[in-house]
Amino acid sequence: RFSGCQCRYPTNNFGHCLHGGPQGWQYQVYEGQIVNDSTVTMTMHSPDGDANFPGAVTAVVTYTLTSDNAIDIKYEATTDKKTVINMTNHSYFNLSGDPTKPVTDHILYINADKYTPVDSTFMTTGEILDVKGTPMDFTQPHEIGRDITNFGFEQIKFANGFDHNWCLNTNGDDTQVAARVVVSVWKYTLTNRESRYTVVTSSTDQ
């Protein structure tokens, strides 16, 4: 409910509206602009009432390749009404260099002692649970594939793998490592200022 108006949103996931619905922003065409040799911006205009969401929104994503070969992503959005905006990056990385190979041999570390479980419709339950003693524990680095088919664990069954949110121990300190993935000679390290981190492995047969 926004500004006294109850809004109904299009559903696309077990009766829920996921990622803005079936025509979410990820499916829209953005206006690209080259800022300099290392930076581009992508801008999208969403009109008031788009997918029943209130407010005309201008969303801007800025991608910068830094001097130390990192990718910096910044999000901005302006709107003329109260609305819901929760922009993020949804990239997938396969460090093997071969997209036909699964990521089950990738070594994953997540700096998190807790996670938020989901129900059978893939909505978070509101609980915050300990990872210790469960397949959700990546505080000691190990292969993603070790428990990815452990369907006796309900959370893996619901997600058909991993598609969960971990509560980071970093407390918003972006000088600490939030997560790391290693395979062969390649390493992907994530830092951020947020308190949560989501890992998605697609389905177990991919």
Which ranges hold each PLM region?
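An exposed, glycine/acidic-rich loop-and-rim segment of catalytic or binding clefts
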Residues: 1-206
